[in-house]
Amino acid sequence: PHQNSATEHISFETAKAIGETITMRIENKAKQSKPIVEGATFLKEIEREGEQYGVYELTSQQVVIKGNISFLYCERNNITKVDLTHAATLWGAQLNENQISEIDVSNNVELTQLRCDDNKVSILDLTSNSKLRWLSCNNNQIRQLTLPKKSELLVAYCSFNKLTTLDISGQNKLEDLFCFDNKISRLDLTQCAELLTLACHNNVISELK
């Protein structure tokens, strides 16, 4: 069940000092109402590759974004903790190059895109995210990656982790799988009828179906 906009929010903690700046792009479902940012003061907008991003000055090391957030871009902000559990409308999160060790997306049933490369995540459970189409979680410390049993997943990038197993049964729409530089011993692709690209080198694979 979706929560109302009064309780919808995303929060995170950063290792950056008060007075330093962070850069974010926040999209919300209700275009007429801007999300409220607590813990950081808006300074200016900048443009990157045709997209508008906001530069904010930290007034606290804990930042709360209130509103019906549909997409959050929050890369390279020294984030140590992030809470997405109160963002039921979230369809996309881009959290690359932070220091995040845990990402709970169990309540984000609308999520179609998750990018969290270059963090410290060890367990990533995506069983609730059946609408997920794009996953990129390269260069973490992931030893357990659980994909939804039946999903819309097209692209999965999970290289440079600590995976020993990778269950991709039920991923019958998967087109690209990059899982190199792990410790995977067995890979069963029999249900991946749409698979176009596979990169699984630098593992310990003894059985490939």
Model region roles, listed by residue range:
Residues A87-L90, N108-L111, T127-L132, P148-L153, ...:
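Leucine-rich repeat
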Residues C200, S206-K209:
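Short, intrinsically disordered, charge-balanced linker/junction segments flanking boundaries
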Residues N77, L95-N98, C116-N119, N140, ...:
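Consensus "Asn ladder" position of solenoid repeat domains
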Residues V82, I103, L124-L126, L145-L147, ...:
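Canonical leucine-rich repeat
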Residues P1-G92, V109, S151:
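N-terminal capping/linker segments that flank leucine-rich repeat
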Residues T85-K120, T127, N138:
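Conserved, compact domain cores that house catalytic/ligand-binding motifs in diverse enzymes
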Residues L72-C74, W91-L95, T112-C116, R133-C137, ...:
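Conserved hydrophobic beta-strand positions in leucine-rich repeat
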